[in-house]
Swiss-Prot record:
GO biological process, one term: tail-anchored membrane protein insertion into ER membrane
Protein species of origin: Theileria parva (East coast fever infection agent)
Residue positions of the active site: D64
Protein name per UniProt: ATPase ASNA1 homolog
Compartments in which it is found: Cytoplasm; Endoplasmic reticulum
Length: 361
Protein backbone atom coordinates (compact mmCIF):
# COMPACT_ATOMS: atom_id res chain seq x y z
CA UNK A 1 0.00 0.00 0.00
CA UNK A 2 1.32 3.46 -0.88
CA UNK A 3 2.44 5.80 1.86
CA UNK A 4 -0.32 8.30 1.01
CA UNK A 5 -3.12 5.71 0.92
CA UNK A 6 -5.01 4.18 3.82
CA UNK A 7 -8.14 2.14 4.26
CA UNK A 8 -10.65 3.57 6.70
CA UNK A 9 -12.84 1.61 9.09
CA UNK A 10 -15.73 1.91 6.62
CA UNK A 11 -13.71 0.42 3.76
CA UNK A 12 -12.93 3.68 1.95
CA UNK A 13 -9.53 3.98 0.28
CA UNK A 14 -8.53 7.43 1.51
CA UNK A 15 -5.52 9.51 0.55
CA UNK A 16 -3.85 12.72 1.66
CA UNK A 17 -3.51 13.98 -1.90
CA UNK A 18 -5.76 14.51 -4.93
CA UNK A 19 -4.40 11.74 -7.16
CA UNK A 20 -7.59 9.68 -7.17
CA UNK A 21 -9.62 12.82 -7.86
CA UNK A 22 -7.68 13.92 -10.93
CA UNK A 23 -7.25 10.39 -12.27
CA UNK A 24 -10.95 9.48 -12.24
CA UNK A 25 -11.82 9.99 -15.89
CA UNK A 26 -15.58 9.71 -15.41
CA UNK A 27 -15.84 13.08 -13.68
CA UNK A 28 -17.54 15.73 -15.82
CA UNK A 29 -18.13 18.40 -13.16
CA UNK A 30 -15.88 19.20 -10.21
CA UNK A 31 -17.13 21.93 -7.89
CA UNK A 32 -14.73 23.72 -5.55
CA UNK A 33 -16.38 25.60 -2.69
CA UNK A 34 -15.92 27.09 0.75
CA UNK A 35 -15.88 30.33 2.67
CA UNK A 36 -14.57 33.46 0.95
CA UNK A 37 -10.85 34.09 1.41
CA UNK A 38 -9.74 30.49 1.99
CA UNK A 39 -8.00 30.06 -1.37
CA UNK A 40 -10.76 28.40 -3.42
CA UNK A 41 -9.59 30.05 -6.63
CA UNK A 42 -5.96 28.97 -6.17
CA UNK A 43 -7.11 25.40 -5.52
CA UNK A 44 -9.52 25.51 -8.50
CA UNK A 45 -6.77 26.77 -10.80
CA UNK A 46 -4.32 24.17 -9.50
CA UNK A 47 -6.77 21.29 -9.95
CA UNK A 48 -7.54 22.51 -13.47
CA UNK A 49 -3.83 22.69 -14.22
CA UNK A 50 -3.31 19.10 -13.07
CA UNK A 51 -6.37 17.91 -14.99
CA UNK A 52 -5.10 19.55 -18.19
CA UNK A 53 -2.20 17.08 -18.13
CA UNK A 54 -4.59 14.13 -17.92
CA UNK A 55 -7.72 15.11 -19.87
CA UNK A 56 -8.28 16.16 -23.46
CA UNK A 57 -9.82 19.54 -22.64
CA UNK A 58 -10.60 21.36 -19.38
CA UNK A 59 -12.84 24.36 -18.68
CA UNK A 60 -12.38 26.37 -15.48
CA UNK A 61 -15.55 28.36 -14.84
CA UNK A 62 -15.87 30.95 -12.07
CA UNK A 63 -19.36 31.65 -10.72
CA UNK A 64 -17.99 33.88 -7.96
CA UNK A 65 -19.06 37.54 -8.39
CA UNK A 66 -15.64 38.56 -7.01
CA UNK A 67 -13.93 36.85 -10.00
CA UNK A 68 -10.35 35.97 -9.12
CA UNK A 69 -9.40 33.80 -12.11
CA UNK A 70 -8.09 36.82 -14.01
CA UNK A 71 -5.96 37.78 -11.01
CA UNK A 72 -4.75 34.22 -10.43
CA UNK A 73 -3.56 33.69 -14.01
CA UNK A 74 -2.58 37.33 -14.65
CA UNK A 75 -4.86 37.22 -17.68
CA UNK A 76 -8.20 38.84 -18.45
CA UNK A 77 -11.14 36.43 -18.74
CA UNK A 78 -14.73 37.17 -19.77
CA UNK A 79 -17.98 35.23 -20.18
CA UNK A 80 -16.47 33.47 -23.21
CA UNK A 81 -14.11 30.48 -22.76
CA UNK A 82 -10.54 31.70 -23.32
CA UNK A 83 -7.38 29.61 -23.64
CA UNK A 84 -5.19 30.12 -20.57
CA UNK A 85 -1.67 31.33 -21.30
CA UNK A 86 0.89 28.56 -20.93
CA UNK A 87 -1.60 25.76 -21.67
CA UNK A 88 -2.80 24.01 -24.81
CA UNK A 89 -6.13 22.63 -23.55
CA UNK A 90 -7.14 24.63 -20.45
CA UNK A 91 -9.82 27.29 -20.92
CA UNK A 92 -11.26 29.73 -18.40
CA UNK A 93 -14.31 31.98 -18.16
CA UNK A 94 -15.94 34.17 -15.50
CA UNK A 95 -19.69 34.52 -14.95
CA UNK A 96 -21.68 36.39 -12.32
CA UNK A 97 -24.63 34.12 -11.61
CA UNK A 98 -26.61 36.99 -10.08
CA UNK A 99 -26.38 38.86 -13.41
CA UNK A 100 -25.90 36.00 -15.84
CA UNK A 101 -28.99 36.90 -17.87
CA UNK A 102 -27.36 40.24 -18.69
CA UNK A 103 -24.13 38.71 -19.99
CA UNK A 104 -23.22 37.65 -23.50
CA UNK A 105 -23.22 33.99 -22.52
CA UNK A 106 -26.45 33.38 -24.40
CA UNK A 107 -28.88 32.77 -21.57
CA UNK A 108 -31.61 34.60 -23.44
CA UNK A 109 -34.49 32.42 -22.28
CA UNK A 110 -34.12 33.50 -18.66
CA UNK A 111 -33.76 37.16 -19.62
CA UNK A 112 -36.81 37.15 -21.89
CA UNK A 113 -38.87 35.20 -19.38
CA UNK A 114 -38.06 37.62 -16.55
CA UNK A 115 -39.04 40.53 -18.80
CA UNK A 116 -42.45 39.07 -19.64
CA UNK A 117 -43.72 37.67 -16.34
CA UNK A 118 -45.70 39.97 -14.03
CA UNK A 119 -43.59 42.08 -11.68
CA UNK A 120 -45.39 40.35 -8.82
CA UNK A 121 -43.40 37.18 -9.56
CA UNK A 122 -40.19 39.01 -10.40
CA UNK A 123 -40.14 40.12 -6.76
CA UNK A 124 -40.21 36.55 -5.43
CA UNK A 125 -36.90 35.91 -3.58
CA UNK A 126 -34.29 34.12 -5.66
CA UNK A 127 -36.27 33.75 -8.90
CA UNK A 128 -33.74 35.51 -11.14
CA UNK A 129 -30.75 33.67 -9.70
CA UNK A 130 -32.58 30.34 -9.61
CA UNK A 131 -33.69 30.49 -13.23
CA UNK A 132 -30.36 31.91 -14.45
CA UNK A 133 -28.34 29.18 -12.78
CA UNK A 134 -30.69 26.56 -14.14
CA UNK A 135 -30.18 27.78 -17.68
CA UNK A 136 -26.45 28.28 -17.10
CA UNK A 137 -25.98 24.63 -16.16
CA UNK A 138 -28.07 23.56 -19.14
CA UNK A 139 -25.71 25.50 -21.41
CA UNK A 140 -22.63 24.18 -19.63
CA UNK A 141 -23.96 20.64 -19.93
CA UNK A 142 -23.82 20.88 -23.72
CA UNK A 143 -20.21 22.13 -23.81
CA UNK A 144 -17.69 19.74 -25.34
CA UNK A 145 -15.08 19.69 -22.58
CA UNK A 146 -13.73 16.54 -20.95
CA UNK A 147 -14.23 18.05 -17.51
CA UNK A 148 -15.44 21.36 -16.09
CA UNK A 149 -14.09 22.76 -12.81
CA UNK A 150 -16.40 25.26 -11.08
CA UNK A 151 -14.77 27.91 -8.91
CA UNK A 152 -17.92 28.62 -6.93
CA UNK A 153 -19.08 31.67 -5.02
CA UNK A 154 -18.69 31.73 -1.20
CA UNK A 155 -20.66 29.17 0.79
CA UNK A 156 -23.89 31.19 1.10
CA UNK A 157 -24.27 31.44 -2.69
CA UNK A 158 -23.44 27.76 -3.09
CA UNK A 159 -26.07 26.74 -0.54
CA UNK A 160 -28.61 28.84 -2.44
CA UNK A 161 -27.73 26.94 -5.60
CA UNK A 162 -28.20 23.60 -3.83
CA UNK A 163 -31.66 24.74 -2.79
CA UNK A 164 -32.73 25.64 -6.35
CA UNK A 165 -35.18 22.74 -6.76
CA UNK A 166 -36.95 23.76 -3.55
CA UNK A 167 -36.91 27.40 -4.70
CA UNK A 168 -38.63 26.52 -7.97
CA UNK A 169 -41.16 24.35 -6.14
CA UNK A 170 -42.03 27.34 -3.96
CA UNK A 171 -42.27 29.59 -7.02
CA UNK A 172 -44.73 27.22 -8.66
CA UNK A 173 -46.71 26.95 -5.43
CA UNK A 174 -46.77 30.74 -5.04
CA UNK A 175 -47.89 31.16 -8.63
CA UNK A 176 -50.80 28.76 -8.16
CA UNK A 177 -51.86 30.37 -4.88
CA UNK A 178 -51.83 33.90 -6.28
CA UNK A 179 -53.57 32.81 -9.47
CA UNK A 180 -56.31 31.03 -7.54
CA UNK A 181 -56.85 33.96 -5.18
CA UNK A 182 -57.01 36.68 -7.80
CA UNK A 183 -57.31 35.02 -11.20
CA UNK A 184 -59.32 37.86 -12.77
CA UNK A 185 -56.90 40.50 -11.48
CA UNK A 186 -54.00 38.42 -12.80
CA UNK A 187 -55.50 38.37 -16.29
CA UNK A 188 -56.05 42.13 -16.23
CA UNK A 189 -52.55 42.71 -14.85
CA UNK A 190 -51.01 40.55 -17.56
CA UNK A 191 -52.98 42.32 -20.30
CA UNK A 192 -51.97 45.79 -19.09
CA UNK A 193 -48.29 44.86 -18.75
CA UNK A 194 -47.87 42.72 -21.87
CA UNK A 195 -47.07 39.75 -19.62
CA UNK A 196 -47.32 36.16 -20.75
CA UNK A 197 -50.64 34.38 -20.22
CA UNK A 198 -50.74 32.59 -16.88
CA UNK A 199 -50.80 29.17 -18.58
CA UNK A 200 -47.57 29.95 -20.44
CA UNK A 201 -45.90 31.30 -17.29
CA UNK A 202 -46.83 28.14 -15.44
CA UNK A 203 -45.57 25.90 -18.24
CA UNK A 204 -42.27 27.78 -18.47
CA UNK A 205 -41.73 27.46 -14.72
CA UNK A 206 -42.49 23.75 -14.96
CA UNK A 207 -40.01 23.40 -17.84
CA UNK A 208 -37.31 25.21 -15.86
CA UNK A 209 -37.92 22.85 -12.95
CA UNK A 210 -37.90 19.81 -15.24
CA UNK A 211 -34.59 20.89 -16.77
CA UNK A 212 -33.15 21.54 -13.33
CA UNK A 213 -34.21 18.06 -12.23
CA UNK A 214 -32.18 16.58 -15.10
CA UNK A 215 -29.20 18.69 -14.07
CA UNK A 216 -29.55 17.67 -10.43
CA UNK A 217 -29.55 14.03 -11.54
CA UNK A 218 -26.08 14.59 -12.97
CA UNK A 219 -25.10 16.50 -9.84
CA UNK A 220 -26.13 13.49 -7.73
CA UNK A 221 -24.19 10.98 -9.84
CA UNK A 222 -20.94 10.37 -7.88
CA UNK A 223 -19.27 9.00 -11.00
CA UNK A 224 -19.81 12.25 -12.91
CA UNK A 225 -19.87 14.98 -10.26
CA UNK A 226 -18.01 15.67 -7.04
CA UNK A 227 -17.54 18.58 -4.67
CA UNK A 228 -14.21 19.65 -3.15
CA UNK A 229 -14.43 21.66 0.07
CA UNK A 230 -11.66 24.16 0.80
CA UNK A 231 -11.16 25.58 4.27
CA UNK A 232 -8.55 27.09 6.57
CA UNK A 233 -8.07 26.12 10.24
CA UNK A 234 -10.22 28.93 11.65
CA UNK A 235 -13.62 28.88 13.35
CA UNK A 236 -15.79 30.51 10.65
CA UNK A 237 -14.22 28.50 7.86
CA UNK A 238 -14.62 25.17 9.66
CA UNK A 239 -18.19 26.11 10.61
CA UNK A 240 -19.13 26.97 7.00
CA UNK A 241 -17.42 23.82 5.75
CA UNK A 242 -19.63 21.74 8.04
CA UNK A 243 -22.73 23.62 6.79
CA UNK A 244 -21.71 22.94 3.20
CA UNK A 245 -20.97 19.27 3.80
CA UNK A 246 -24.29 18.78 5.58
CA UNK A 247 -26.15 20.45 2.69
CA UNK A 248 -24.31 18.32 0.13
CA UNK A 249 -25.18 15.18 2.09
CA UNK A 250 -28.81 16.29 2.31
CA UNK A 251 -28.98 16.72 -1.48
CA UNK A 252 -27.04 13.47 -2.15
CA UNK A 253 -24.13 15.21 -3.88
CA UNK A 254 -20.76 13.47 -3.58
CA UNK A 255 -18.14 15.19 -1.46
CA UNK A 256 -15.09 13.20 -0.46
CA UNK A 257 -12.26 15.76 -0.50
CA UNK A 258 -11.42 18.46 2.02
CA UNK A 259 -8.42 20.67 1.36
CA UNK A 260 -7.15 22.46 4.46
CA UNK A 261 -5.27 25.48 3.16
CA UNK A 262 -2.79 27.94 4.73
CA UNK A 263 -1.57 25.58 7.46
CA UNK A 264 1.25 27.08 9.53
CA UNK A 265 4.37 25.26 10.71
CA UNK A 266 5.78 25.53 14.23
CA UNK A 267 9.11 27.35 14.58
CA UNK A 268 11.55 27.52 17.50
CA UNK A 269 14.35 30.07 17.22
CA UNK A 270 15.20 30.42 20.90
CA UNK A 271 18.16 28.03 20.76
CA UNK A 272 19.52 29.74 17.64
CA UNK A 273 19.17 33.16 19.24
CA UNK A 274 20.89 32.00 22.42
CA UNK A 275 23.81 30.44 20.51
CA UNK A 276 24.21 33.55 18.38
CA UNK A 277 24.22 35.80 21.43
CA UNK A 278 26.90 33.65 23.09
CA UNK A 279 29.08 33.81 19.99
CA UNK A 280 28.93 37.61 20.01
CA UNK A 281 30.09 38.19 23.59
CA UNK A 282 33.08 40.26 22.44
CA UNK A 283 30.90 42.95 20.87
CA UNK A 284 30.89 46.42 22.31
CA UNK A 285 28.03 47.15 24.75
CA UNK A 286 26.42 49.48 22.21
CA UNK A 287 26.42 46.89 19.41
CA UNK A 288 25.32 44.15 21.78
CA UNK A 289 22.37 46.30 22.86
CA UNK A 290 21.31 46.79 19.24
CA UNK A 291 21.50 43.05 18.54
CA UNK A 292 19.61 42.21 21.72
CA UNK A 293 16.79 44.48 20.56
CA UNK A 294 16.81 42.73 17.20
CA UNK A 295 16.69 39.26 18.77
CA UNK A 296 13.88 40.40 21.04
CA UNK A 297 11.85 41.38 17.97
CA UNK A 298 12.63 38.03 16.32
CA UNK A 299 11.37 36.11 19.35
CA UNK A 300 8.29 38.33 19.54
CA UNK A 301 7.43 37.49 15.93
CA UNK A 302 8.04 33.81 16.68
CA UNK A 303 5.63 33.95 19.62
CA UNK A 304 3.00 35.73 17.51
CA UNK A 305 3.27 33.10 14.78
CA UNK A 306 3.19 30.20 17.21
CA UNK A 307 0.23 31.78 19.01
CA UNK A 308 -1.69 31.79 15.75
CA UNK A 309 -0.51 28.24 15.11
CA UNK A 310 -1.91 27.16 18.49
CA UNK A 311 -5.31 28.50 17.42
CA UNK A 312 -5.00 26.64 14.10
CA UNK A 313 -4.17 23.39 15.90
CA UNK A 314 -7.44 23.60 17.83
CA UNK A 315 -9.46 23.71 14.61
CA UNK A 316 -7.24 21.14 12.92
CA UNK A 317 -8.19 18.80 15.76
CA UNK A 318 -11.86 19.62 15.09
CA UNK A 319 -11.36 18.78 11.40
CA UNK A 320 -9.73 15.46 12.32
CA UNK A 321 -12.53 14.51 14.72
CA UNK A 322 -15.25 15.45 12.24
CA UNK A 323 -13.86 14.09 8.97
CA UNK A 324 -10.84 11.80 9.40
CA UNK A 325 -11.68 8.32 8.21
CA UNK A 326 -14.53 9.58 6.01
CA UNK A 327 -12.88 12.12 3.69
CA UNK A 328 -9.66 12.50 1.74
CA UNK A 329 -8.04 15.34 3.70
CA UNK A 330 -5.15 17.28 2.17
CA UNK A 331 -3.22 19.86 4.21
CA UNK A 332 -1.50 22.64 2.28
CA UNK A 333 1.11 24.69 4.12
CA UNK A 334 1.03 28.47 4.10
CA UNK A 335 2.71 29.43 0.83
CA UNK A 336 5.64 31.83 1.01
CA UNK A 337 4.73 33.77 -2.10
CA UNK A 338 1.64 35.08 -3.85
CA UNK A 339 0.38 32.47 -6.32
CA UNK A 340 -0.14 34.40 -9.56
CA UNK A 341 0.51 33.40 -13.14
CA UNK A 342 0.54 30.03 -14.89
CA UNK A 343 4.01 29.03 -13.72
CA UNK A 344 3.27 29.82 -10.07
CA UNK A 345 0.03 27.83 -10.27
CA UNK A 346 1.82 24.86 -11.84
CA UNK A 347 4.35 24.97 -9.01
CA UNK A 348 1.67 25.27 -6.33
CA UNK A 349 -0.31 22.38 -7.82
CA UNK A 350 2.54 20.00 -6.99
CA UNK A 351 1.59 20.30 -3.31
CA UNK A 352 -1.84 18.81 -4.07
CA UNK A 353 -0.21 15.67 -5.48
CA UNK A 354 2.15 15.15 -2.53
CA UNK A 355 1.34 13.11 0.56
CA UNK A 356 0.08 15.94 2.80
CA UNK A 357 -1.74 14.73 5.92
CA UNK A 358 -3.03 17.24 8.44
CA UNK A 359 -0.48 17.70 11.24
CA UNK A 360 -0.92 16.31 14.71
CA UNK A 361 -2.35 18.82 17.15
Amino acid sequence: MEESSMESDNGLNLRNDVKNLVEQETYKWIFVGGKGGVGKTTISCSLSSILSERRESVLLLSTDPAHSLSDAFNQKFTDTPTLVNGYENLYAMELDVTRVADTGFGLNETKMFLQTIPELFQMLPGIDEALSFSELLQSVQSMKYSVIVFDTAPTGHTLKFLNLPDTLDKLLESFLKVESLCGVAMKLFSALNNSLPKEEIFQKLKRFKSNLTLIMNQMKDPNRTTFVCVCIPEFLSVYETERLIQSLAKTDIDCSYIIVNQVLSYINLEEHVKNTQNSLENLSPENKKVLDCFFELVLEQQNNLNGRLSIQRKYIEDIKQLYEGFFNIVAIKQYKYEVRGSEAIKEFSKALLKHSPIPDS
